[in-house]
């Protein structure tokens, strides 16, 4: 009887030791195998990206939360780009016809905004003058951009070769369209074409992840 009991106890000890070894091997593989570490990290990044929501706001009364010197912290510095092409604030002489702000930040912040304003005659001329005095940058070739549609006249444009474009377009009926397309490292992670009227986008503009401009910059 005692011998049988000894065999049972030894079996339990052996089983316990085997379990310990299995646990050790498991943790060794998880923490010290680079391939598995990279795989786990990739899954973690993917999971975090999926949990990050695209934030959108179309309420014009929130305009100064996102644009100008009084913008909230996460919108105050958009990769160092100068967004003074946009109006500093919304005033009584502006009839806002359309507005949208999109923000996405899974790891690197991305912004898309547009504002369509109809001005009275006097204010329209003043705004045209302000924008024409802006130190506009050469933009063709960046992100595939070739120009703008014939119905618009480009009034001012800011360009960053890594982070995007900010510009203003003149349309008929005293209307001006302001657009900012700001992202990190040559492309958007959002479906930006679903967020803005494509008529407002430059001809040839491509900020999808596999865009040709992105590939050229990586190969430089």
What are the roles of these predicted feature ranges?
Residues 1-24:
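Cytosolic-side transmembrane helix boundary signature
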Residues 20-39, 43:
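Hydrophobic membrane-insertion alpha-helices, especially the h-region
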Residues 4, 40-44, 96, 154, ...:
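Acidic/proline-rich low-complexity IDRs
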Residues 35-119, 123:
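N-terminal export/targeting and maturation segments
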Residues 7, 71, 83, 144-147:
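Polar low-complexity intrinsically disordered regions enriched in Ser/Thr and small residues
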Residues 127-220:
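Extracytoplasmic electrostatic interaction patches
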């Amino acid at each position: 009887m005692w011998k049988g009991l000894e065999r049972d106890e030894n079996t339990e000890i052996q089983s316990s030791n085997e379990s310990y070894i299995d646990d050790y091997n498991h943790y060794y593989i998880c923490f010290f195998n680079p391939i598995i570490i990279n795989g786990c990290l990739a899954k973690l990044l993917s999971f975090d990206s999926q949990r990050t929501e695209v934030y959108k706001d179309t309420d014009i009364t929130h305009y100064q939360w996102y644009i100008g010197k009084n913008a909230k912290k996460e919108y105050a510095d958009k990769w160092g780009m100068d967004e003074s092409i946009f109006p500093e604030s919304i005033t009584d002489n502006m009839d806002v016809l359309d507005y949208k702000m999109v923000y996405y930040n899974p790891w690197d912040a991305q912004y898309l905004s547009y504002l369509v304003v109809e001005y009275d005659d006097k204010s329209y001329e003043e705004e045209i003058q302000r924008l024409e005095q802006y130190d506009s940058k050469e933009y063709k070739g960046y992100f595939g951009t070739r120009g703008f549609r014939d119905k618009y006249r480009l009034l001012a444009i800011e360009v960053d070769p890594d982070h995007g474009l900010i510009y203003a377009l003149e349309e008929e009926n005293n209307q001006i369209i302001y657009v900012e397309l700001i992202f990190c490292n040559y492309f958007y992670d959002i479906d930006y074409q679903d967020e803005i009227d494509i008529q407002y986008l430059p001809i040839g503009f491509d900020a999808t992840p596999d865009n040709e401009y992105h590939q050229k910059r990586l190969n430089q």
